[in-house]
């Protein structure tokens, strides 16, 4: 027999009408809004990425904090210390290298465009009447001085033993270049007041450290991460002239060059370049307190392993001019870049005025002339995204200073090469109009 079901009546209270319920809801809303308005709004710090997290946002925040530290540096020495403090593996860029087509690689590393020929001379203001005109150049005297310097090392100086071919650069060409530069600077000082107060260095080191491009770390505990490509140039010109005022620019700072920079898609290891880890250096040839902190002209002497005769024996005639161009691009970029950083500029605070320097590359007989204008230091991947500026290098083909030396006679002396050296040394800083009137 089925159990009997018991139904109990459900007692319900009195319900509210729709009008009453709507009024109650409106009153509750007004009360809530008044409470929220009366409560002070909490001000929380902005949500930023962690400084120690392994993410892109955290990496960008660490970079921004480091850049803010550099911007806040009170002096140039402090800024250089922060920029060169962290030591990582970096590529060693050698200005004088036997690598094939090194000039194209160096153009990419330094964001430099190479233009054949020398730049046009800057437009000079109308000269004011001077009470005492400058003395005219005596080409015959300059030619005699250059010939005496050649004969001093090739004929007059009696050595105890015969100089081998692989020793000519160090034993003969190096003292000849020293004597030629010092003599010409002394003779041309009356024509160029900047030379009289300039500093002439012999075998003074020049260093520059910079970042260009990125790579994915292939191995190690940081495998797969994105890292910067770092470069270091340790140069040692034979002679260099430093002045207290900056040379005049050849072209405007934002001059648009129609030539594209060679793009290298391979890693620098293929050049080949090798990585080392040691202290990062940025050095122009003197300390930051030296008043002669601007470059005028460098003189570089090629080693015997890069001499023209040796390259011809190796069937590398097409690499003769490449050696000159690569040396000029790397050396002048390092020198002008160090000058710019001595003035407080760096990759995140790009230059506001161009920096200009000149170079003479020689093997003792053949001379090549180059002019360099640094227009940008923003070479990192982040800084170079919207940067149309390019560094510019002008250069000439190498020409012989003389044909041969027989006994006590220099045959086939080339006056054009000597005049070009003189023209480089006579280049002076651009003076303001007020200074011209005072003089």
Swiss-Prot record:
Cellular compartment(s): Mitochondrion
Principal location class: mitochondrion
Keyword Mitochondrion: yes
Keyword Transmembrane: no
GO biological process, alphabetically ordered: apoptotic process; mitochondrial translation
InterPro entries reported for this sequence: Ribosomal_mL37/mL65 (IPR010793), Ribosomal_mL65 (IPR039982)
Entry's Gene Ontology cellular component terms: mitochondrial inner membrane; mitochondrial large ribosomal subunit; mitochondrion
Expression across tissues: Heart, skeletal muscle, kidney and liver. Lower expression in placenta and peripheral blood leukocytes.
Keywords assigned by UniProt, alphabetized: Mitochondrion, Ribonucleoprotein, Ribosomal protein
Membrane spanning residue stretches: none
Listed GO MF terms: RNA binding; structural constituent of ribosome
Superkingdom of this protein's organism: Eukaryota
PANTHER family: LARGE RIBOSOMAL SUBUNIT PROTEIN ML65, MITOCHONDRIAL 28S RIBOSOMAL PROTEIN S30/P52 PRO-APOTOTIC PROTEIN
Subunit structure: Component of the mitochondrial large ribosomal subunit (mt-LSU). Mature mammalian 55S mitochondrial ribosomes consist of a small (28S) and a large (39S) subunit. The 28S small subunit contains a 12S ribosomal RNA (12S mt-rRNA) and 30 different proteins. The 39S large subunit contains a 16S rRNA (16S mt-rRNA), a copy of mitochondrial valine transfer RNA (mt-tRNA(Val)), which plays an integral structural role, and 52 different proteins. mL65 forms a heterodimer with mL37.
Family: Belongs to the mitochondrion-specific ribosomal protein mL65 family.
Protein name (record): Large ribosomal subunit protein mL65
Species of the source: Homo sapiens (Human)
Recorded name of the encoding gene: MRPS30
């Amino acid at each position: 027999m089925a159990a009997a079901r018991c139904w109990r009546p459900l007692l319900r209270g009195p319900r509210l009408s729709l009008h009453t319920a709507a009024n109650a809801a409106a009153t509750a809303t007004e009360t809530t809004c008044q409470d929220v308005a009366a409560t002070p709004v909490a001000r929380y710090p902005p949500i930023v990425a962690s400084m120690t997290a392994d993410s892109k946002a955290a990496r960008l925040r660490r970079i921004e904090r480091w850049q803010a530290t550099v911007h806040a540096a009170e002096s140039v020495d402090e800024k250089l210390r922060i920029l060169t403090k962290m030591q990582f593996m970096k590529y060693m860029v050698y200005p004088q290298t036997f690598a094939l087509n090194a000039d194209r690689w160096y153009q990419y590393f330094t964001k430099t465009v190479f233009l054949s020929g020398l730049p046009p001379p800057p437009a000079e203001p109308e000269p004011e009447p001077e009470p005492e005109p400058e003395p005219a150049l005596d080409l015959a005297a300059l030619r005699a001085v250059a010939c005496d310097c050649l004969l001093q090392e090739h004929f007059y100086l009696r050595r105890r033993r015969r100089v081998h071919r692989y020793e000519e650069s160090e034993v003969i060409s190096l003292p000849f270049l020293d004597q030629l530069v010092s003599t010409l600077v002394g003779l041309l000082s009356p024509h160029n007041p900047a030379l009289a107060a300039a500093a002439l260095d012999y075998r003074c080191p020049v260093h520059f450290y910079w970042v260009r491009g990125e790579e994915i770390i292939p191995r190690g505990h940081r495998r797969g991460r994105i890292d910067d490509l770092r470069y270091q140039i340790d140069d040692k010109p034979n002679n260099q002239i430093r002045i207290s005022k900056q040379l005049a620019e050849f072209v405007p700072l934002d001059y648009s060059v129609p030539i594209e920079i060679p793009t290298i898609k391979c890693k620098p290891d293929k050049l080949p370049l090798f990585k080392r880890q040691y202290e990062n250096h940025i050095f122009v040839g003197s300390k930051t307190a030296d008043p002669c902190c601007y470059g005028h002209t460098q003189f570089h002497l090629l080693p015997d392993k890069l001499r023209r005769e040796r390259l011809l024996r190796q069937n590398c005639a097409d690499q003769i001019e490449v050696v000159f161009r690569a040396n000029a691009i790397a050396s002048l970029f390092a020198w002008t870049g160090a000058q710019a950083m001595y003035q407080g500029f760096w990759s995140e605070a790009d230059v506001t005025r161009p920096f200009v320097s000149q170079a003479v590359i020689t093997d003792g007989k053949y001379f090549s002339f180059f002019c360099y204008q640094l227009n940008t230091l923003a070479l990192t991947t982040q800084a170079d995204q919207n940067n149309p500026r390019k560094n510019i290098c002008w250069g000439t083909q190498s020409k012989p200073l003389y044909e041969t030396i027989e006994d006590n006679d220099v045959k086939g002396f080339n006056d054009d090469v000597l005049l070009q050296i003189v023209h480089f040394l006579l280049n002076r800083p651009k003076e303001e109009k007020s200074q011209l009137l005072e003089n």
